[in-house]
Amino acid sequence: DHQATNASTKELFAHLRKDDQWIVRDDVFIKFLERKGPLTVGYGSPGRTGPELEFGTVMGNYFEEPVILIKAAWGGHSLYKLFRSPSAGFPAEGELDKELKQAQERVAKNNEKNKKNDPLPTMEDIKKPYGSSYRNMMAELKDVIDNSGTMFPALKGRKLEVAGFVWFQGWNDQYGAENEYESNMKHFIKDIRKDLNAPKLPFVIAAMGQNGSKPAKGAMLIIQQA
């Protein structure tokens, strides 16, 4: 609210407000984890608003039909591991062996330090997290697709069409997985189109602005160029 009312910045937010209040759209709806409703502020992390507000406003202004945003986002999840899609398979066996060894060493060290007897991780434990966020995301998408009329009564009876997919993740892939990012992204796009039965589904890959006006370099540059 401070930026929206401050003289030096309020013009940036003027199109999102009316009568000194945040606009609540009646033509754009959003589902974000446990929250759902007409698009307005508050659909980011607790007490915050994310890119969905501006994006949804642009989409709502462009389309005559109502718009639903299905936001499935979990911070700190990489495409290499948690968002890894089925056709990408698992990393090379040597990488999994290395991960298993490190996990077992951590548990053994913690057991010794705290006089505990926790079981050492198995290869099954190591493999289980791979693709978990992809599976959760697809379950979230399909739940909204199947139950949009119940979640948003104003849209009851209307046929829902999946019109596009926006990817705004990848920060964590710069920490050792940048060279696999391009391959994993190709698998990701292919699998989503297959799972949603939408072979020509448009994809938009957004770039984050943490570096401000400074160009990306190193691992992040590799990811952006993928």
Task: Kindly give the residue locations of the regions a language model identified.
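Cell-envelope and extracellular/periplasmic
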Residues: 1-226
